[in-house]
Swiss-Prot record:
Protein encoded by which gene: NOL12
Similarity comment: Belongs to the RRP17 family.
Any Pfam family matching the protein: Nop25
Gene Ontology MF: a single term: rRNA binding
Organism name: Pongo abelii (Sumatran orangutan)
Protein's name according to its UniProt entry: Nucleolar protein 12
Taxonomic placement: Eukaryota, Metazoa, Chordata, Craniata, Vertebrata
Annotated coiled-coil segments of the chain: 33-96
Entry GO terms, CC: cytoplasm; nucleolus
Role summary: Multifunctional RNA binding protein that plays a role in RNA metabolism and DNA maintenance. Participates in the resolution of DNA stress and the maintenance of genome integrity by localizing to sites of DNA insults. Also plays a role in proper nucleolar organization by limiting nucleolar size and regulating nucleolar number. Mechanistically, regulates the nucleolar levels of fibrillarin and nucleolin, two key players in pre-rRNA processing and ribosome assembly.
Subunit structure comment from the entry: Interacts with KIAA1191.
Biased composition (Basic residues): 170-182
InterPro entries (UniProt xref): Nucleolar_protein_12
Length: 213
C-alpha cells in the first residue's frame, strides 16, 4: 500500500476560524425577560389605540364643525328670503280727509301688491269676506322659521370609535376575584345555647315536674 500523501495548503487558502462567545448577562436577560417584553408590547398597543382614537375624534369634530357651518349658512339664506318676501308684500295706502262743520271724515283706500301676476308668490283667490283676506295677509307675511333637521352621524365612524374604546378598556381592566360568603355552611351549624338564670331553670324544672305528675 502506498503512503497517504498529505496535501500542503498554502497560508492564503486557509479560512479564518469563527469564535463564538456568549454574553451571560444578555443571555440571562433574554431567557428571563419574556414577561417584560410582553408588557412592553401591550403598552405599545395601548398607545397606538389611543392615538387612533384621538385621530377619529378629531375627524368627527371637524365633520360636526362643517355640518354646523353649512346649517348656519342655510338658515341665514332662509332668513334673507323671508326678509325679501316681507319687503315685497307691502300695501299702498291713500287717505283723503273731508272737513265738515260738525265732524271730520277720512277715506282710506288700500291696494295690495299683486305678486301672483309677476309669478313671485302664488296667492289663492279669496273665497270669503274681509276676515278671510286678513287671514291670508297674516299667513303670507308671517313665515315660520323652523330649525333645520340635524343630519345623522356617520354610523361606520361611530362603530369604529366604540370598538377602539372597548379594546382600550379591555386592556386596562384588571381581574378582581371576589370571595363568596359561605352562607350554606353557616346555616348548617346548630344554634348556640344561651345562658339562663337560676330562677328560670327552677321554673323550667318545676313545670316539667308538674307535667309529669
Amino acid at each position: 500500500m502506498g503512503r497517504n500523501k498529505k496535501k500542503k495548503r498554502d497560508g492564503d487558502d486557509r479560512r479564518p476560524r469563527l469564535v463564538l462567545s456568549f454574553d451571560e448577562e444578555k443571555r440571562r436577560e433574554y431567557l428571563t425577560g419574556f414577561h417584560k417584553r410582553k408588557v412592553e408590547r401591550k403598552k405599545a398597543a395601548i398607545e397606538e389605540i389611543k392615538q387612533r382614537l384621538k385621530e377619529e375624534q378629531r375627524k368627527l369634530r371637524e365633520e360636526r364643525h362643517q355640518e354646523y357651518l353649512k346649517m348656519l349658512a342655510e338658515r341665514e339664506e332662509a332668513l334673507e328670503e323671508a326678509d325679501e318676501l316681507d319687503r315685497l308684500v307691502t300695501a299702498k295706502t291713500e287717505s283723503v280727509q273731508y272737513d265738515h262743520p260738525n265732524h271730520t271724515v277720512t277715506a282710506t283706500t288700500i291696494s295690495d301688491l299683486d305678486l301672483s301676476g309677476a309669478r313671485l308668490l302664488g296667492l289663492t283667490p279669496p273665497e270669503g269676506g274681509a276676515g278671510d283676506e286678513s287671514e291670508e295677509e297674516a299667513s303670507s307675511t308671517e313665515k315660520p322659521t323652523k330649525a333645520l333637521p340635524r343630519k345623522s352621524r356617520d354610523p361606520l365612524l361611530s362603530q369604529r370609535i366604540s370598538s377602539l374604546t372597548a379594546s382600550l378598556h379591555a386592556h386596562s381592566r384588571k381581574k378582581v376575584k371576589r370571595k363568596h360568603p359561605r352562607q350554606a355552611q353557616d346555616s348548617k351549624k346548630p344554634p348556640r345555647a344561651t345562658r339562663t338564670s337560676k330562677a328560670q331553670r327552677r321554673r323550667l324544672t318545676g313545670k316539667a315536674q308538674h307535667s309529669r305528675e
